[in-house]
């Protein structure tokens, strides 16, 4: 358009051209529309997505050399202050870069492909028998997500399986998990999908998946108006000789095969009855538009997650130097939690924080946070697990779940955490933190002033993510030997 502008305007002289890219607010809220209303949430979301295209501009990028007059005109037309207009010589829209890898020889420019380890202990047709005896931890992307997908297909074909219930937040394109759920519904299983339509920038994808799953016969629920459903929870209910058995999956990341190759996440698969009962209660309450209060095993936000977390921090604080708190999350800004961690440090309790992104708690401040350390791993994969560890030795407790320590997670979302009690699974979670602690190549250590530095005295190179590939490949075969021994 810019190139042919003189032709477009006939006899007029074009003095100046520029490419302007406008970024608009993505903040759409259904709360005001839905409160006290029985409107169809999917239809409401579709209207809101159309409205998003007309929301107020928050930024403009101008590509090329432009005059002050042109800049002023762009700001006036868009209603933007000077600080929100950016002039760049680079292309304003870089999305074309994603198509470039297929056009060039990138030999030597990319990381070597490392396929995820297959858990050889699991054989198709044997999943329920295995899980009846063992908990299983899947560590992504070091191990494949395929066992979970296979479990859904096995549930679909098992005549004793009554239902599959799952929370869905961000699905991959051409999702095999969505296909497995549709297959189960088409083969007579009751499949209930609690699909969060408000997953930012995945709204349209989730609307499309809701229609596909509904057409296959799945029951589609859209969660609660006041709380986003962010928990990663799947429940398979099956008839067993003694009655009903629950097989539950609690995870830290989305049911997304694409991010399973790029994000570090954990999935716990268990037949623990208490976890199953809590999961069943959770799906029942959410189906009625209610949150979950008292539970046996799971920590569930917004009611139970933060109080349980604070109680465990307080218990370690009372132990002073004998206590230990280890936390791995993506981000932290919850003021109450941070204040409690400061108290723990003041009592002499060791507090290790592994926070990949924003952390509003500064470590190493004399008299306040000198027993707190903050470490971030920035490597090939995006660190995404949420892990809590309390105590030392045999009394040590380990938890994994879906929520960060942002106030939106502790107060305004549905999240779920579970204890990891199986000795093998527990050891594997602890090894993740141990590897991050030893990393001296991709680690960044927060300083008291909020800056980050590489570890001092690095010594022999150790990359946690590379090590964990090797570790979890070996773990798969360890599980096989243990399973064969018990048989």
Feature-to-residue mapping (PLM):
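Extended, highly charged clamp/arch subdomains and adjacent linkers
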Residues: 1-91, 107-112, 126, 133-143
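Structured alpha-helical segments in the cores of large, soluble enzyme domains
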Residues: 4-10, 37-49, 141-155, 174-185, ...
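Signature of lipid phosphatidyltransferase scaffolds
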Residues: 6-12, 18-22, 235-310, 396-402, ...
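Generic beta-strand/beta-sheet core signal
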Residues: 23, 61-63, 139-141, 165-169, ...
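Active-site cores of enzymes that catalyze phosphoryl transfer or operate on phosphate-rich substrates
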Residues: 82-163, 242-310
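Primarily the HKD phosphodiesterase
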Residues: 157-216, 309-373
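Phosphate/diphosphate-binding loops
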Residues: 197-262, 374-395
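Conserved small/polar residues in nucleotide/adenosyl-binding loops
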Residues: 478-487
